[in-house]
Amino acid sequence: MDKLLIKASKPLQGSVRISGAKNAALPILMSSILADTTCYFDNVPELRDINTSLALLAELGADAKRVSGHAVEIDPSSINNCNASYDLVKTMRASILVLGPLLAKYGEANVSLPGGCAIGARPVNLHLQGLEKMGAKIDVEAGYIRAKVDGRLKGANIFMDMVSVGATENLMMAACLADGETVLENAAREPEIVDLANCLNAMGAKVTHAGSDKIRIQGVERLQGCRYAVLPDRIETGTFLIAAAVTGGKIRCENAAPETLDAVLDKLVMAGAVITTGDDWIELDMQGHPLTSVNIKTAPHPGFPTDMQAQFVALNCVAQGTGVVTENIFENRFMHVPELQRMGAKIDLETNSAVCHGVSSLKGAQVMATDLRASASLVIAGLVAEGETVVDRIYHLDRGYEHIETKLNGLGANIQRIK
């Protein structure tokens, strides 16, 4: 099993190209199920979860392949079964996103209950309740969701009890081929939702007001394939910016989307960084500026993203003062804290908050990644820890970061992938 061996880094310097967003690419790949003809997707990152998605689409019968580095081609016309098996779905929570498209296009779907990161209860009931409002008959038995509909799904007014990115995506896709108008209230507002809506519209869908909490979808009879480029990954961008900040460096993130990172950039400025942005780039300069701890409260977009919480815990560990990081989205999302404590971090856990008391230095240690973003926080800590840090179970990292050690080494880090 691969590990990362990290040695203390000089201040990171230089420029790094940001990959396409995993959290946008996954639903966009699944949306191809809705089309009658071939879809061509660009800026698709090379990640384990993307490979799992392509394998899942192939299992359904689609011709799904990566044709070059970041280009993916999917011909859905050969789909001949509606069964998403446990073997693939167990490794990736986003597999649930085949449910809505299969049901809308083919009238049935049998999807194993999903896996993914073990960061608390993330129930699929909102997905199922919404599809039932659109006329689906759904049973959950033997670990599978079995859904059917007679004829087309019907447009409906759907109010979601809580904000859910996955449910918003699944229902938005299903509604594109429904009969009539669907209104999603209390919808998620993340940039990845907007990106999916733009892709669906490029296929011929009629989705409006994505990015607001009330999305309208006028169903159409057919969708066609399209060419679409996935938006840049705001979480990868934020992770590199924090890595530069904790090392006292200066970096430029190219192929970025600054408008998707307002909450993160604001906190980095509060931490002492000088931030400059352009249309598709972000520059952070921490040279000569003391790193100051910040308070964070995660919230649905446009609030502070939960996927950046662990990285800011790592920042607070080596910043001046005390910073409180409060997790309001998921329970059980502080599994990185005991690992950071092994490196000498002073963190007190209080219910859903991590109280981080900055220390002058961390010490290298053997640590274990527990989920995707937690693993990123350990890499960040390793960059500034004295001695060597070994991060185990980095398959979590490979699910969401494209060639992270290569990119960081290009900025001056010293990281090796070892067995």
Swiss-Prot record:
NCBIfam families: murA, PRK09369.1. The keyword Transport does not apply. UDP-N-acetyl-alpha-D-glucosamine binds at R93, D307, I329. Pfam families: EPSP_synthase. GO terms for biological process: cell division; cell wall organization; peptidoglycan biosynthetic process; regulation of cell shape; UDP-N-acetylgalactosamine biosynthetic process. HAMAP family: MurA (MF_00111). Gene3D superfamilies: Enolpyruvate transferase domain. This is UDP-N-acetylglucosamine 1-carboxyvinyltransferase. Its EC number is 2.5.1.7. GO terms for cellular component: cytoplasm. It is found in: Cytoplasm. The modification 2-(S-cysteinyl)pyruvic acid O-phosphothioketal is found at C117. GO terms for molecular function: UDP-N-acetylglucosamine 1-carboxyvinyltransferase activity. InterPro entries: Enolpyruvate_Tfrase_dom, Enolpyruvate_Tfrase_sf, MurA_subfamily, RNA3'P_cycl/enolpyr_Trfase_a/b, UDP_GlcNAc_COvinyl_MurA. Cell wall formation. Adds enolpyruvyl to UDP-N-acetylglucosamine. Phosphoenolpyruvate binds at K22, N23. It comes from Pseudoalteromonas atlantica (strain T6c / ATCC BAA-1087). The active site is at C117. It catalyses: phosphoenolpyruvate + UDP-N-acetyl-alpha-D-glucosamine = UDP-N-acetyl-3-O-(1-carboxyvinyl)-alpha-D-glucosamine + phosphate. The keyword Protein transport does not apply. Keywords: Cell cycle, Cell division, Cell shape, Cell wall biogenesis/degradation, Cytoplasm, Peptidoglycan synthesis, Pyruvate, Transferase. Pathway: Cell wall biogenesis; peptidoglycan biosynthesis. Belongs to the EPSP synthase family. MurA subfamily.
